[in-house]
């Protein structure tokens, strides 16, 4: 079993306190997640914004979310954001149908929010179940676990060999002090990411 980037831990630490740089992106993130919470729409923050929570921040202009949506949520989500955001109902509907991505843009701040409709695979269900409730600027926000963020970034880097994604993984491995290495090894192997995981651990 590969072990790198911290001690093994077998449970989550919900309610974790953290911070993100004050920015338009943070303001939009708080606005979007508060609306989703108010509408009882399950979500989690992922991508660069999540990496900035767990590790040394880098500049990002986009916000990435995974959302649980069904056909009956299409109109509700569109109405929820259509006043302050550019959002296309047809794009939302296609994303729900195909378990794909739609995006919306804050009209005033021009911050883009990419929303991926959660896929119905075993891993994506487990990843979503492991999301963490954290406090950012006094607001509860659900965020991907650091282990699943590492796996996602390895997956994104697998085909593209993106150095930025691999650097993000190394940053996370250095910064997060308690990682479930058993979980990381198991899913890296099952997802065909074990060689890339070994590479970043060297």
Regions found by a protein language model. Give the residues of each.
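Compositionally biased terminal segments of proteins
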Residues: 2-202
């Amino acid at each position: 079993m590969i072990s790198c980037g911290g001690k093994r831990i077998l449970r989550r630490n919900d309610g974790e306190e953290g911070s993100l740089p004050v920015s338009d992106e943070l303001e939009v993130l708080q606005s979007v997640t508060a609306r989703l919470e108010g509408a009882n729409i399950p979500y989690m923050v992922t991508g660069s914004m999540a990496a900035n929570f767990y590790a040394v921040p880098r500049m990002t202009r986009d916000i990435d979310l995974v959302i649980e949506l069904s056909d009956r949520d299409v109109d509700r989500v569109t109405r929820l954001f259509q006043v302050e955001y550019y959002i296309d109902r047809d794009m939302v509907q296609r994303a729900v149908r195909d378990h794909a991505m739609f995006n919306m843009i804050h009209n005033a701040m021009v911050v883009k929010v990419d929303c991926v409709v959660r896929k119905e695979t075993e891993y994506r269900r487990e990843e979503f179940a492991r999301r963490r409730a954290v406090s950012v600027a006094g607001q509860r926000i659900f965020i991907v676990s650091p282990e699943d963020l590492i796996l996602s970034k390895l997956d994104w880097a697998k085909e593209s060999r993106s150095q930025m994604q691999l650097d993000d993984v190394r940053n996370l491995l250095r910064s997060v002090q308690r990682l479930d290495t058993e979980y990381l090894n198991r899913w890296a192997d099952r997802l065909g990411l074990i060689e890339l995981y070994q590479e970043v651990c060297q």
